[in-house]
Amino acid sequence: MLRLILPTLTLFALLISGPAAAQTVKESAALATMSGSALMKMPAKKLFGSQKKPADLAARAIGSYAKGCLAGAKSLPVNGPAWQVMRLSRNRNWGHPDLVALIEKLATESKQFDGWNGLLVGDLAQPRGGPMLSGHASHQVGLDADVWLTQMPDRILTNGERENLEATLVVKDRKTIDTSVWTEAHARLIKRAASYPEVARIFVHPPIKAELCKWATGDRSWLAKLRPYYGHNYHFHIRINCPRGSTTCKNQPPSRPADGTGCGAELAYWMSDVPWAKRKADPNAKPPKPAPPLTLAALPAECRAVLTVQ
């Protein structure tokens, strides 16, 4: 029993130092040699949040967007001809190769055709996907990416600027677009992203969807992919479909609003007070117990191999 406890304690000591600590071969070996039961009980966000390099396996998105992992990840270069990656300290510029290719295509085409000077790219996924130590519930299988609604400057940002530069809000409040910030280039950028067939959904703040519903002409079917959701007032969130070869990846149901665009009842709901209303707390109710952390056991079985391969 002591032989199992000591490696587990050692591994916890390595992991609690956080994502800034460099992963070593010794750490990978410790994961690979732990007993299955001990490893499965560990918090998945600690295990995956400590990984610094991708799993040297064939590229596969495994599981669902909010419960899975990523094999064979590819990094989006931090600087490109039409993009720059932000918040480099997070080491979240990893994705399935299909996602990385799509971001590069969107950056290049929006600069060439849409009057968008270049993308500032936020989080994709961790090197091996999985739950994160902070932030997103999704972004676990390398098929999600955040793109800022701020144009790239005409120079290379310093690392310090990438950590501290604030993105520009494009809304005044939860119902109103800020017309002093919003431009037609914003609209063309989002339309281009939604028009790619591999894109499943794009999450935006409700007034952004409302503005695009007013702006769009001709074929408006791309609007169906735009889903209003909280917190997307300075960036939009691209989600692509499961790639070919990712046989255990789970797609979400296609976005098919009844009106064909989502500009009707669905948008009206998000522009109302209902989704934003705070529930009244019962003063006599006992405080709920916090949910236990997601463990490796809760993820698809393949994620253990993704985690432990050296």
Spell out what each predicted region is.
Residues 1-9:
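Bacterial N-terminal signal peptides that target proteins for export
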Residues 17-19:
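N-terminal signal peptide c-region/cleavage motif recognized by signal peptidases
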Residues 24-36, 40, 161-310:
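Catalytic cores and adjacent binding grooves of peptidoglycan-active enzymes
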Residues 25-66:
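Solvent-exposed N-terminal domain segments of exported/luminal and surface proteins
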Residues 48-51, 102-134, 203-225:
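Extended, low-complexity, intrinsically disordered C-terminal regulatory tails
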Residues 56-121, 182-192, 196:
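Active-site acidic/histidine clusters and adjacent loop/turn architecture
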Residues 114-116, 140-144, 233-235:
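Extracytoplasmic
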Residues 126-179, 238:
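Acidic/His-rich structured neighborhood in mature extracellular/periplasmic domains
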